[in-house]
């Protein structure tokens, strides 16, 4: 069985990706980057989600000699011109501080009416092989931003995005419900046939 490295150390994301890929029928041995603690984090210097996903996937594939899958994702708010976008995880200035990022975003949108609170989650999922072969696919989840966080599931901005056609936020959905409609779920389900094509 081919080992496939998931280019993240985020435990929540590893769990989510394993579930999405397993549900899509991928049977490869999926291992998080946390299994390789000596490999340094990659600087996300790209200007798009796709560029950052490819940077991470290539770095891990080169360092391990194994195929690697990475994603870059974030929240794009219409009234903010697509921000925080690629800066979603460090919007408050502290990388990975979900609460601070969420608080800053809500403060920035405090005077914005419901009609102008449109946003979407975006995800670029990339596969890189040690020989340099690469593929990238993208997915989106459109919705509206609530004024206050609701729900305890998920992570990041999940407590404020209410997907189109839903009455609950992403953080109120079960993992299965969220994965079925999420930006990450869409992108990684699209990546599965690419993995099968390139890795067998």
From Swiss-Prot:
Active site: residue positions: 72
Stored Gene3D superfamilies: 3.90.950.10
EC number: 3.6.1.66
Residues binding Mg(2+): 72
GO CC annotation terms, alphabetical: cytosol
Catalysed reactions, semicolon-separated: XTP + H2O = XMP + diphosphate + H(+); dITP + H2O = dIMP + diphosphate + H(+); ITP + H2O = IMP + diphosphate + H(+)
Record note on quaternary structure: Homodimer.
Entries under PANTHER family matching the protein: INOSINE TRIPHOSPHATE PYROPHOSPHATASE, INOSINE TRIPHOSPHATE PYROPHOSPHATASE/HAM1 PROTEIN
Protein name: dITP/XTP pyrophosphatase
